[in-house]
Amino acid sequence: PVAMFYYSYQPQGVSPGCRTRILRHLELQMNGDEPLAFFITWTVYGSFLQGDNRWWRKRQQGEQPPQPKLAQWHRDRLNHLVLILDEPQRLAVVNEIARLCEYRGWQLWKAVARTNHVHAVVTATGYAGSRVRDQLKANCTRVLREQWAIFVDRPVWTTGGDWQCVNTEEELDRVILYVSEAQDRKELDA
């Protein structure tokens, strides 16, 4: 089971400010204007290390092939156990994303918390994707630590995360479909 929210599509205005970003599973076209939305992803601490056999991303170099020795090197250096999110924790994350988006006046198109990562599709006019991601992560961390002692005094998430600009309604539909279904149906992940 996956905790999800889906909101109907209502286009926002555009203004200057985004660059091209490419995901292995989705290629998004950038038009130089403020994006229609951000596709934001972050992972649970230790669950997706550099060298991972599922491929991994290297800053400014994109997708990288598996490197088992590198992945093992990172695993050996983890300072905390790797935790996965159970259903109540995933629901708490999705609810907090929805709460924060409403509070900030951001449009939440979709939020899904999986056992080892989180996806959110958000329109936040006037904000950088990294800032939106960081605010979502910080608030989700607070909620998890308030409700579950296991998350206190340890990192909950991997440092950083990913954000991609979504500029067209077609891209928005593809991203929402990916977040909703492609994790379970990899044939849609093309």
Residue ranges and their predicted role:
Residues 1-190:
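Short catalytic/metal-binding and nucleic-acid-binding patches
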